A protein has these predicted regions:
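Conserved core segment of the aminotransferase class I/II
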Residues: 4-75, 175
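Short, conserved active-site loop motifs that form the nucleotide-linked donor/cofactor pocket
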Residues: 5, 95, 127
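Short beta-strand segments
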Residues: 9, 23-25, 99, 105-109, ...
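Conserved C-terminal alpha-helix-loop-beta "cap" of PLP-dependent enzymes
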Residues: 31, 35, 108-148, 156
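A common structural junction motif
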Residues: 42, 124-130, 167-175
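Inter-domain helical "communication" segments and dimerization helices
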Residues: 55-66, 86-87, 91, 117, ...
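Conserved glycine-rich beta-strand-loop-beta hairpin in the small C-terminal domain of fold type I
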Residues: 68-82, 94-109
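PLP-dependent enzyme catalytic core of the Aspartate aminotransferase-like
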Residues: 140-180
Length: 180
């Protein structure tokens, strides 16, 4: 059934965080329905921002080259995070994660009931991170286990300190949960 699919994409992390442009792919029937909804919700699209993106991204080749530049900047940051998780957390079995092959986040799934406490301990130590359960609707993670790490902003030197604090906070939260 072609009317079951709505596929979305955005340039938000590629160009201007929070000010990217988005696209939607769907069936003709779904598109007609969405156009009716959107017609009521907005007077006009931000055409200046759309033009800004067209001029900046230019074409597929230029966009792919830009993404390679992003990868070169982000790769050492992701390596830093993954290296610390593998060294400090993997042997303990208190969390799991996937090694991303793209994107801007590492999603860490702790043992149930550890995410909020882990981030509270991080905050006490001076490290602010995205809220626990941010990947869930309304930020409500029924298992209190999901933490999204976004390593793109800090330089690697600061990231090394922050991820060490994160790992130690997760260990402490696990010990508290176990009553040790």
């Amino acid at each position: 059934n072609p009317d079951m699919v709505f596929e979305y994409a955005s340039t938000s992390k590629i160009t201007l965080p929070g000010a990217g442009i988005s696209v939607m792919a769907t069936s003709t029937a779904n598109l007609a329905y969405m156009e009716k909804l959107m017609d009521i919700q907005m007077i006009s699209y931000d055409k200046v921002n759309q033009l800004r993106h067209v001029l900046f991204l230019q074409d597929k080749a230029h966009t792919l080259a830009l993404m390679q530049q992003h990868a070169a900047i982000l790769r050492p940051k992701f390596r830093c995070v993954l290296r610390c998780l593998e060294r400090e957390i993997a042997p303990l079995g208190i969390a799991a994660w996937q090694k991303p092959t793209g994107g801007y986040f590492v999603s860490v799934n702790t043992l149930p009931g550890l995410a909020k406490r882990t981030l509270a301990l991080c905050k006490e130590a001076g490290v602010t991170m995205t809220g626990a359960g941010a990947t869930f609707p309304y930020g409500i993670d029924p298992n209190d286990s999901n933490i999204r790490i976004a390593p793109s902003l800090p330089p690697v030197s600061e990231l090394e300190q922050a991820i060490a604090i994160f790992c130690n906070s997760l260990k402490l939260a696990a010990l508290e949960k176990l009553g040790v």
